[in-house]
Curated annotation (Swiss-Prot):
Residues 150-391 form the Radical SAM core domain. It is found in: Cytoplasm. Residues 18-133 form the MTTase N-terminal domain. GO terms for cellular component: cytosol. [4Fe-4S] cluster 1 binds at C27, C63, C92. It comes from Leptothrix cholodnii (strain ATCC 51168 / LMG 8142 / SP-6) (Leptothrix discophora (strain SP-6)). Its EC number is 2.8.4.4. InterPro entries: Elp3/MiaA/NifB-like_rSAM (IPR006638), Methylthiotransferase (IPR005839), Methylthiotransferase_CS (IPR020612), Methylthiotransferase_N (IPR013848), Methylthiotransferase_N_sf (IPR038135), NA-bd_OB-fold (IPR012340), Ribosomal_uS12_MeSTrfase_RimO (IPR005840), rSAM (IPR007197). This is Ribosomal protein uS12 methylthiotransferase RimO. SMART domains: Elp3. One of its GO terms (biological process) is tRNA modification.
């Protein structure tokens, strides 16, 4: 989870701007909500404080997806109240109901100033204005071109839609974020262009269901750069790829459900327009488990689809997440999942032991497994996943790869850390770059370097500058 307090530029010289403490918890989608709020705060002349003490007010953007996240969010709200006393709560936990149908946050922390759900920038700002009046009207030139970002300058998340039309039995996101609402394609592309112009070298496309982009508006035609563009995944990815090419940048796709039309994007990857990387939330492989999960798409054809993708784009890297120990999962169904993992050769796989989430329909299913069994299956899954990943990484030894540099002490003369096209930030591995043999070879954070792979270590590769 992200736990960030950000210092915004103070726009008004000679006058102390009101200070807002800010904490962002949760997933990249919550992070983009935080960035929107921070951008608006900056535009209106607010600064932020890195500590709760001394701030005029504190905003906590919460996560409410799993029980651990709920506890962390409630604890953070409590800390902010204890240290500051003036707290606005936003995010997924803000939409969660407690006992008797009342708001959970209000029940646990009745003294908070305001509570909103996710993607509620205007509601948050209205609450801020009520308790800490804005110092002046916003002017666009007070805000950096890329807005206020919680990520390093060289990469950023681009949220293309909100909500989800699926009703997976283990998930409560639709109850918190609502049904799918696609952003207008012109707005998405305008934001992407602004990010690239602001120095972003890697754009990570996120949503609850990237493949469903435009379904809610029946793929209506929008406009970008004076030309008609359909609101659908293929058209969006193609336009993002062209923008990235002009700026020498990457586009990476996340939360891609394996619908048949995803096949149309593979040629764009094969020609290098976007990264040959797909983050696909398979969750399981056995058809019966997928039915109990109420997962969309034809799960029994996922292996066939993967093989087709690799035929169209041999260099493609697939990452996915899975759940072990779902209610009713038999040993045979779990073994089926392990066999799928071996045959599918998932490059990057993560696994969670099933955890009941308050309000999720899966809680009502028969066959709940003991904690020990769920954790044991998660460990077995990860052992297989790591063996597959290690073997695939070892095959890269001797090759050369383009790496986006994330860390480079002393201009890289002490070595550095970067990521290849196969590595998304925070969730995948890295490329550890050895100190160069010649002092003339340097690296710079946020720029690309060519690296020869000389070894592997766990989930990471080891390379040397070419």
């Amino acid at each position: 989870m992200n736990d960030l307090a950000i210092s915004l530029p103070t726009p008004a010289a000679g006058a102390a701007a009101p200070r807002i403490g800010f904490v962002s918890l949760g997933c990249p989608k919550a992070l983009t909500d935080s960035e929107l709020i921070l951008t608006q705060l900056s535009a209106e002349g607010y600064a932020t404080s890195k500590t709760f003490q001394g701030a005029d007010l504190v905003i906590v953007n919460t996560c409410g997806f799993i029980d651990d996240a709920v506890r962390e969010s409630l604890d953070t709200i409590g800390e902010a109240l204890a240290e500051n006393g003036k707290v606005i709560v936003t995010g997924c936990l803000g939409a969660k109901t407690g006992d008797g149908g009342g708001n959970l946050v209000r029940q646990m922390h009745p003294s908070v100033l305001a509570v909103t759900g996710p993607h509620a920038t205007q509601e948050v700002m209205d609450a801020v204005h009520q308790h800490v009046p804005k110092p002046h009207d916003p002017f666009v030139d007070l805000v950096p071109p890329a807005g206020i970002k919680l990520t390093p300058k060289h990469y950023a998340y681009l949220k293309i839609s909100e909500g989800c039309n699926h009703r997976c039995s283990f998930c409560i996101i639709p109850s918190m974020r609502g049904d799918l609402v696609s952003r207008p394609i012109g707005d998405v592309l305008t934001e992407a262009q602004r990010l690239f112009e602001g120095g972003v070298k890697e754009l990570l496309v996120i949503s609850q269901d990237t493949s469903a982009y435009g379904v809610d508006v029946k793929y209506r035609t929008g406009f970008w750069d004076g030309k008609p563009v359909k609101t659908r995944m293929l058209d969006l990815v193609a336009q993002l790829g062209e923008l990235a090419r002009k700026h020498g940048a990457w586009v990476r796709l996340h939360y891609v459900y394996p619908y048949p039309h995803v096949d149309e994007v593979l040629p764009l990857m094969a020609e290098g327009l976007v990264l040959p990387y797909l983050d696909v939330p398979f969750q399981h492989a056995h058809p019966d488990v997928l039915k109990r999960m109420k997962r969309p798409a034809s799960g029994e054809r996922n292996l066939e689809r993967l093989l087709k993708w690799r035929e169209a784009c041999p260099q493609i890297v697939v990452r996915s997440t899975f759940i072990a120990g779902f209610p009713g999962e038999t040993e045979a169904e779990f073994e089926y999942l392990l066999d799928f993992l071996k045959e599918a050769q998932i490059d990057r796989a993560g696994c969670f032991a099933y955890s009941p989430i308050e309000g999720a329909p899966a809680n009502l299913l028969d066959g709940a497994l003991p904690d020990a069994v769920r954790e044991e299956r998660r460990a077995r899954f990860m052992a297989v996943a790591e063996a597959v990943s290690t073997a695939k990484l070892q095959r890269r030894v001797g090759s050369s790869m383009q790496v986006l540099v994330d860390s480079a002490p002393a201009m890289g003369r002490k070595g550095g850390v970067g990521r290849s096209y196969a590595d998304a930030p925070e969730i995948d591995g890295t490329v550890k770059i050895l100190p160069p043999s010649k002092a003339s070879k340097t690296m710079k954070v946020g720029e690309f370097s060519r690296v020869r792979i000389v070894g592997s270590q766990g989930h990471d590769l080891i390379g040397e500058l070419i």
